[in-house]
């Protein structure tokens, strides 16, 4: 991944993520942290959401990241494709540490930490 894209992803904190089930797309927005090693996008999701149900079966995602304050004349953004990972306790601990260090208030909100491995951005 190019350094300019890594820097852009690292500077921002909201992503729009899309998943799909039976050719029906579904999108959601989330706060994220980024782990450069492995190109991992970490987010937290409430339990029993529609996107969590879809991602249980279909791990492929796509999404966008744009600045929180968009200037129409100079809009920039990153589009990505990736896959949801379920790689055990070590990844879960690393992802949780990354996410909660960026969003400590999220510790009191019920939900599940999820990890997207970016395959293209």
What are these regions (language model features)?
Residues 22-25, 71-73, 106-107:
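Short glycine/serine/proline-enriched coil/turn segments at secondary-structure junctions
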Residues 76-121:
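Charged, gly/pro-rich active-site loop segments
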């Amino acid at each position: 991944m190019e350094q300019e894209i890594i820097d852009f992803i690292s500077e921002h904190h909201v992503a729009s993520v899309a998943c799909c089930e039976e050719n029906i797309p579904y999108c959601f927005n989330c706060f994220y942290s980024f782990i450069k090693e492995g190109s991992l996008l970490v987010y937290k999701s409430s339990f029993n959401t529609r996107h969590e149900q879809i991602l249980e079966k279909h791990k492929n995602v796509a999404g966008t990241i744009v600045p929180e304050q968009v200037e129409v004349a100079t809009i920039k953004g990153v589009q990505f494709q990736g896959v949801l990972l379920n790689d055990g306790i070590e990844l879960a601990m690393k992802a949780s540490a990354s996410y909660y260090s960026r969003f400590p208030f999220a510790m009191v909100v019920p939900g599940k930490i999820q990890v997207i491995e970016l395959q293209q951005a």
